[in-house]
Amino acid sequence: ITMKKILFIGLSIAAMISCSRAKETIEYGDYQDNTSENPTKMAKVIYGEDHSMISNPERGFCTRNGYHSRSSVISDYEINTLKSSKHTLVFFDFKLKEFISSPINSDMLGMMQRNFDKLRANGIKAVVRFTYSSSTSAAVYDAEPSIVLKHISQLKPILEKNKDVIALIEAGFIGAYGEWYYSTHYGNKGQADYAKRRTIINAMLDAFPKERMIAVRTPLIKTNLLNISLNSPLTQSEAFNRSNKARLGHHNDCFLADEKDRGTYTGEQDKKYTQLDSKYTVVGGETCTPPTSYSQCNAALQTMGKYHWSYLNLSYHQDMIADWKNTHCFEEIQKRLGYRFVMKEVQYTEKMESGKNYK
């Protein structure tokens, strides 16, 4: 069996195989079967690629849902909308503002579990983030390290229990929106306190499921956390070994805004690093501006390919999403986000006899 794997973004474990019966052809010929005495006639089936939208898990568009302790679970309407749109992901932003100086209460933890149960019952997975503030004008952006560490320990069992419906975890916790920029306790850009930040990310890597990656906001955050240079992207031999380097991925929440995506990148070196590193990590995020020259269809598709994008938040920025729909680019992006497995051909023994081994 011969297959090709078309990767537009990052990685996922499972896939649905898509074949087009319309282009199916059968060829016959004599192929040497090394497991039997004589050459055996083999048949070969060649398939054409199905270019339709495939609802593969852990990839594609997602919508953002914010929850606090008094929230109800994701509604049946939202679930049905996801399914009818062939979306397999939802973004859960668990808001911890009311626990910024105290442990997470049982109501909040119970609400999280009910949401994960609802996803499991409907074959959907979540991108998960935990935040303390949802505005750059918030009086306090994040909790003190001792509180965050307590929260991480509280979250450990629930995330482990539900790792089957969690696609990835965004680093969160620090800064406005959990994006590690405007921060109360961990330093701001240019004065970031990486000793404290490493304490938090190391606790997350230790406590959260080893099978899941944690996405950070910029490439320099990853390299600074790991004390490595931009000349050290993941290699094939390092990929998926569950080391901290292999488990840290990327989320860009100002995608296609301008040349540097509003500070996501500082220059060409960290762009190149991310293009190489992202071959083996999860990558996703959201847009943050109205349409730009960088978001025009061909440019957007090319950039998503270079950075191996897996998922994109549909909730923001609405003007850019609308522009993709108006220019007939939306469906193409939806199809290409993530991965596709395509069966190209199958060879099999045309006739078999009892007692012999065949391919």
Predicted regions and their residues:
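Bacterial Sec-dependent N-terminal signal peptides
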Residues: I1-D30
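Boundary/entry segment of secreted carbohydrate-active catalytic domains
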Residues: Y31-L89, D93-K95
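Aromatic-lined substrate-binding rim segments of carbohydrate-active enzymes
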Residues: S75-S133, P145-V148, F208, R212
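An active-site-proximal structural segment forming one wall of the substrate-binding cleft
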Residues: M108-K125, D142-L168, D193-A207
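Active-site groove signature of glycoside hydrolases
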Residues: V127-S137, L155-Q191
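Catalytic-core regions of glycoside hydrolase
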Residues: L168-E170, E179, S183-D319
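Catalytic cores of secreted or luminal carbohydrate-active enzymes
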Residues: Q296-K351
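Structural beta-strand segments of beta-rich domains
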Residues: K356-Y358
